[in-house]
Amino acid sequence: MKKILFMDTTLRDGEQSPGVNLNEQEKLQIARQLERLGIHVMEAGFAAASEGDFQSVKRIANTIQNATVMSLARAKESDIRRAYEAVKGAVSPRLHVFLATSDIHMKYKLCMSKEDVLDSIYRSVTLGKSLFPTVQFSAEDATRTARDFLAEAVEVAIRAGANVINIPDTVGYTNPEEYYSLFKYLQESVPSYEKAIFSCHCHDDLGMAVANSLAAVEGGALQVEGTINGIGERAGNAALEEVAVALHIRKDFYKAEPSMTLKEIKATSTLVSRLTGMVVPKNKAIVGANAFAHESGIHQDGVLKEVTTYEIIEPALVGESQNLFVLGKHSGRHAFTEKMKELGYEFTNDERDAVFEAFKKLADRKKEITEEDLRALMLGEAAFAAQQYNITQLQVHFVSNSTQCATVVLKDEEGNVFEDAATGSGSIEAIYNAIQRILGLECELADYRIQSITQGQDALAHVHVELKEGAHQVSGFGVAQDVLEASARAYVHAAGKLKSFIQLVK
């Protein structure tokens, strides 16, 4: 039975989702979780895009030990050399070079002839191979490329040294039958086919990204590309968790097994959702809140008698636990540390002390702590530690005529303290007005969302905000048991990002 490898592009293609703006620390958190998920290759970013992207890719490359780290690059020498500088420190570095091959792209975007495109492919892959042990070539807009020219371009790339050939459905145009036949055509028409691994990369514009990816596996693809939760620009990418579980459940049909640690799927999905602010729909396959819920009386009766009557996936398979209580206020440092190790978190002594202190404060107010609480706590403390500004004091009181007044005290990374007060028609507006006055911003609140981490009146709150000033839009989140504190943390998180970004572009 063939093993299917997964290339995750959440940190590159996924971050192109409107409103998603991850900082370096957040990208590293996702990369570490992708490593725990057993992802074979992670596309850490586009190193040549900006200095920020370069530094993020480099840090991930120098951190990840058990996965290949890859950077995207155009078929340009400067991009390829920049990618090399970013990932050369990785245990397993890879270059991902791409060039469009469809008539519409060659004519209107590239302004290149077919001969020019073939020459550029050969030169860029040859250069890449002189620097990297593994080179992946993508024929952008492959599904709208003339098949004979696509086969010619692929052959040139393999002869130049490409180890992996990606056949992307860049605009989500194809369907399963066409995509399957395209892979079969290349298998028959590319003389050097056996010298490379073929990969699929599907977008969801017509809602067929997962189905097309599975069709590609049937057609011979050994690598599937996509993102966690299917995030990405426009309608998104193929959701890797859906492809992986489909292959596992229907291995009798696909004769393939996913190379992924399936029990880490739920934790990975939750982390990506909270850091990006992109809510997972309740009815989403595999990771949605209703994925294992049964409302119909007939269905409930059947499941109670025999679970397989209506449930083809065991919740535990993807790490969907019953959220059992795991720790309490009497739990010590050793028990806490061991539980966090079990969940995949490793700390320095300073980090452990800070997170344990936050845990004890939560345990004093919350009767029982669940795994979801611990993950949220870790997420919130990591974001809090990486912020440019932190909240040291927050006070809200009623003034008159439904007006609230908020006093906020912030401390920056150098230890400088800033204090201001403001009013608003509600507590949250007053808090946000005070923070704006301190940071000197004139931004607009583009989005505000709140969700409960777990059930119960003492549950942790997770608040997501999006701020917009001119053409700049960023997101931030905050986690706390108190809604106002979580809201303030989220605003400071986003506002710090916005202030830094505005200063950078100036």
UniProtKB/Swiss-Prot annotation:
Binding-site list for Mn(2+): 13, 201, 203, 237
Molecular function via GO: 2-isopropylmalate synthase activity; acetyl-CoA C-acetyltransferase activity; manganese ion binding
Reactions mediated catalytically: 3-methyl-2-oxobutanoate + acetyl-CoA + H2O = (2S)-2-isopropylmalate + CoA + H(+)
InterPro entries, per the entry: 2-IPM_HCS-like, 2-isopropylmalate_synth_dimer, AIPM/Hcit_synth_CS, Aldolase_TIM, LeuA/HCS_post-cat, LeuA_allosteric_dom_sf, LeuA_bact_synth, PYR_CT
Biological process according to GO: L-leucine biosynthetic process
Pathway entry: Amino-acid biosynthesis; L-leucine biosynthesis; L-leucine from 3-methyl-2-oxobutanoate: step 1/4
Cofactor: Mn(2+)
Highest taxon of the lineage: Bacteria
Transmembrane domains' residue ranges: none
Sequence segments annotated as region (Regulatory domain): 390-506
Catalytic activity, EC: 2.3.3.13
Subcellular location per the Swiss-Prot or TrEMBL entry: Cytoplasm
The keyword Transferase belongs to this UniProt entry's keyword annotation: yes
Primary location: cytoplasm
GO cellular component, one term: cytoplasm
Swiss-Prot/TrEMBL keywords: Amino-acid biosynthesis, Branched-chain amino acid biosynthesis, Cytoplasm, Leucine biosynthesis, Manganese, Metal-binding, Transferase
Endpoints of the signal sequence: none
Quaternary context: Homodimer.
Family classification: Belongs to the alpha-IPM synthase/homocitrate synthase family. LeuA type 1 subfamily.
Free-text function comment from the UniProt entry: Catalyzes the condensation of the acetyl group of acetyl-CoA with 3-methyl-2-oxobutanoate (2-ketoisovalerate) to form 3-carboxy-3-hydroxy-4-methylpentanoate (2-isopropylmalate).
PANTHER family, per database record: 2-ISOPROPYLMALATE SYNTHASE 1, CHLOROPLASTIC-RELATED (PTHR10277:SF9), HOMOCITRATE SYNTHASE-RELATED (PTHR10277)
NCBIfam families according to UniProt: leuA_bact (TIGR00973), PRK00915.1-3 (NF002086), PRK00915.1-5 (NF002088)
Descriptive protein name: 2-isopropylmalate synthase
Organism of this sequence: Bacillus cereus (strain ZK / E33L)
Gene: leuA
